[in-house]
Amino acid sequence: MNLSPIGEACLIAREGRRLRAYRDSVGVWTIGVGHTSAAGPPQVAPGLAITAAECDAIFARDVAAYVAAVRSGLTAPVGPHAFDALVSLCYNIGPSAFAGSTALRRINAGDAAGGAEAMLMWARPAAILGRRRTEAEQFVTPYAA
């Protein structure tokens, strides 16, 4: 399964799209669609600026790694809406945290509702709780046909 166009749009809306480096809510230098140095090149530093095309290329590379992490950890069948929500969660908390998350354990055990509830455990800083709620809602709500 891949990130759907709806999932990609939701993820970009949640992360934002900025062409100049900025500090995120916890002080990490970030650029593009939530790209940090921890995700790989480019290294983000004060004053860094990128073009829209560079932003798109960085996002494509970054999101592919998070899609792969979700595919690797997810053993339960889920719909596109749920897969997209998990990619968004993984993109924000990182592949290692996602792999060890209660949310993933519950989902893989067949407890989708419990998995959605466990997504809300990832609520630090507090400003991220709104995002977690929308991810959990996306996880349990199939896309309209």
Predicted features, each with a name:
Residues 1-28, 35-40, 44, 50-68, ...:
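Long, amphipathic alpha-helical surface segments
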Residues 82:
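Structured, non-membrane catalytic/scaffold regions adjacent to prosthetic-group chemistry
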